[in-house]
């Protein structure tokens, strides 16, 4: 899966759950800029952060 595909899925989850980038960043103890970079395909979350994202949204890692 490409960076853009992962970013699109992250953004889709966030919007589907009616959460802003700021809210997600606060819940994950990260910056809003990090969330933005993921969603635009400029970077991807590390493995531990991806686990936190999955727990936050209650999705399986296979979603990505």
Each model region followed by its residue ranges:
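A short, Lys/Arg-rich alpha-helix, primarily the initiator
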Residues: 1-16
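Residue-level detection of the helix-turn-helix DNA-binding "recognition helix"
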Residues: 11, 15, 29, 40-42
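Short alpha-helical DNA-recognition segment
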Residues: 18-37, 52
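Residues in the helix-turn-helix
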Residues: 23, 34, 44, 60-63
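DNA major-groove recognition helix of helix-turn-helix/homeodomain DNA-binding modules
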Residues: 48-63
């Amino acid at each position: 899966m490409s960076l853009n595909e992962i970013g699109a899925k992250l953004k889709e989850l966030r919007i589907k759950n009616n959460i802003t980038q700021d809210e997600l960043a606060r819940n994950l103890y990260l910056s809003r800029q990090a969330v933005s970079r993921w969603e635009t395909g400029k970077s991807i979350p590390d493995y531990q952060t991806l686990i936190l994202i999955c727990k936050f949204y209650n999705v399986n890692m296979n979603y990505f």
